[in-house]
């Protein structure tokens, strides 16, 4: 509905982003696109693009530690996901300038970023209607820990030991 606003963690509709322009040129240009071209760069499409980029960068990060060009095990890829360090320079080089904020993850911090922004539907397209907001981690972290502790207790899960982090 026109005027509807949504909070976006990291990305939103980004049809002008370099990564989107590259997809349009290199995939859709030669006729290799499989979905509707007008969806490229929209919110759900960007969710997939960001997710795939994070997965690829996790494998790349794992290969930096465990051997470039080698097939990575699931444990090695997990290490890569837990040791991402995508600064603004790297995001820009990947074509993600303006799409998302820098992300740095660890074994203890799988979220990596606490930024969000609001975008609003104008009847034809999504437009950002705020700057980036950062969550107050003094409020969020205790809530996340309490929920995680409850879940682990309910499911009788054992937490990973700090030495298992391998960072």
Range-by-range predicted roles:
Residues 1-50, 132-133, 147:
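Extracellular/periplasmic periplasmic-binding protein-like sensory domains
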Residues 28-29, 67-68, 85, 95, ...:
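Short, flexible coil/linker elements and helix-boundary hinge sites characteristic
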Residues 33-45, 52, 56-130:
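Segments of small-molecule ligand-sensing domains
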Residues 86-90, 160, 167:
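Short, charged N-terminal helix-start/capping segments
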Residues 106-108, 162-167:
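Sequence contexts marking disulfide-bonded cysteines in secreted/extracellular proteins
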Residues 133-161:
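Short, cationic low-complexity segments
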